[in-house]
Amino acid sequence: MFGSDHTLAVIYIDGLVDTLTINHSIMQSLTSKDYDEELHTSDPAEILSIIKNRFLSIGSISDLEHMEPLISAILEGNTVILIDGSSHGVIASSIGGEERGVEEPQSQTVVRGPKEGFTENIRTNTALIRRKIKSPNLWIVDRKIGRVTQTDVAVMYLNGIANDKIVQEILNRLDRIDTDSILESGYIEEFIQDTTFTPFPTITNTERPDAIAGAILEGKIAILVDGTPFALIAPITIFKLFQSSEDYYQKFDIATFLRLLRIISFVVSMLLPSLYIAISTFHQEMLPTTLLISLAAQREGIPFPAVVEALAMEITFEVLREAGVRMPRAMGSAISIVGALVLGQAAVQAGLVSAAMVIIVAFTAIASFVAPSVSIANSARLLRFGFMILAATLGLFGIMAGLLAMLIHLAGLRSFGLPYLTPFAPFIPLDQKDVLVRVPWWAMVTRPTLINRKNAKRQKMNQRPSPSDGNK
C-alpha cells in the first residue's frame, strides 16, 4: 500500500539486484511514513510521477510507458514500480548481485605495469577504461545481441581519432548478427572477422584494461561483451600479436630485444621439428660429420622414421598440455611437468624415440609459450603439423613451398580493410618506429597512419631529452 488508497507493486529478481539499494532507496522511501498529506491527486499516473521525482533517491530512474520493456528491464537487474489503475510504471536502476572483483589477469602477465584485469561485468570494464582515458571523446556505443540471452555489447573508440568507416563497419557487422545466444566474446569474433578459414587471428583479445586503452589511443576499436573478461581489439596486424603492453613501460632497447625474441621463438616453434625431419631424412650432408654420427648413433634401433617419431612426441605433448589446462590448478602443473619428464625418459630408454627428438620437441614447446598472444601461439601449433608433413615428403623444398604459400596467404588477409602485413606490405616508412623495433617515446610522434588519416599526430616534436647546462 502507498498512502491509504493506492496499491504499489515493486518487482525485481533476487540475486540480480543490489539489496542495499532496494531496501534503503526504494522500500524505505515508500514505506517509512504516511504520504496521504503529500499526495494532492488520486490519478495513478500523477502519483507515479510524484514517486519518481520526490520519493525515490536513486541516480537512474526512467519512465515505463508500455509493458514491452518490463521483462527485459527486470531481467537486467532493474526494479520496476507499478501502481494499480495505470498502464505506466517506473524503472529504477538497482543492478547488482554477486560478481568477481578486479584482480590481476591470469593471462598476459607483466613484471612492470598495472596489475588490474577485466571482470565479467561490462560496466566495471568500461569504467576501468574510462579511468585511464578521461576524455569526453571516448564514445561507447551499446548493443544487445542474442534473441534469448540479450547480451550487452559495448563498442568503445575515440571520436576524432578512430576511423569512422571502420567504426561503422564494425557496428554494421554486429547488427547483422542474428543468433539465440552470445555467451563470450569468442562468439562475436567468429561472426565479424574478415576471414574464417585462416589459422591467423584477424581480431585479438585481451583482459588487460591498459592494453585496451593503448589500442584505443592508437585509433583502434574495442569490443566489450558482458559476461567475459576478454575484450576484442580491431583492426590489427600480425606484428601487434608479438607486442606486449609491458613493451611500452620499459626502455626501448629492451622492448625491441624482446619483440625480436618473440618473433624468433614463433618461427622456432613453427619450424624446428620440420627442419629436423627434413635434414635428418633428406639433407644429411648439411650436418657436420660429428653431429651426423651422434644423431645416427641415437637413432640406431629406433623402429620409426623421424616423421612418425616427431608426430608421436608432438601429439603426446599436446595431450599433456590439454590435460594440464583442464585439470584442477593444483594438479595441472604437476601432471604437465611429471608427465613430460616420465614419458620422455621412458620413451628414450625403451628405444622408441631418440634423445635428440625429445630435446627438439621440448624446446619447441618452450618457444611456443613466449608469444604474448595465445591466438598467435595456437597458429604456430596448427602450422607445425603441416610443415612436418611437408618436410617428410619434400624435405627443405617442401618447407620453402609452405613458407611461400603462408606468405601469400598473409599478404591477402585483411582486418576490417587493414592489410595484415602493414606497415611492410604496403610499406609505410613512417610506421616502422613501433613494429619490430620500438623507438623511444619522444620519437613516436604519430599514430599508425594507415588507420588514422585525419588525426595521426600523437604528440609534438622535438621532445628528445638533453642534459641541462649547469653553467647557465
Placement of each model-derived feature along the sequence:
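Membrane-embedded alpha-helical signal segments
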Residues: 1-271, 285, 289, 409-472
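Generic detector of multi-pass transmembrane helix bundles and their immediately adjacent loops
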Residues: 275-278, 288-472
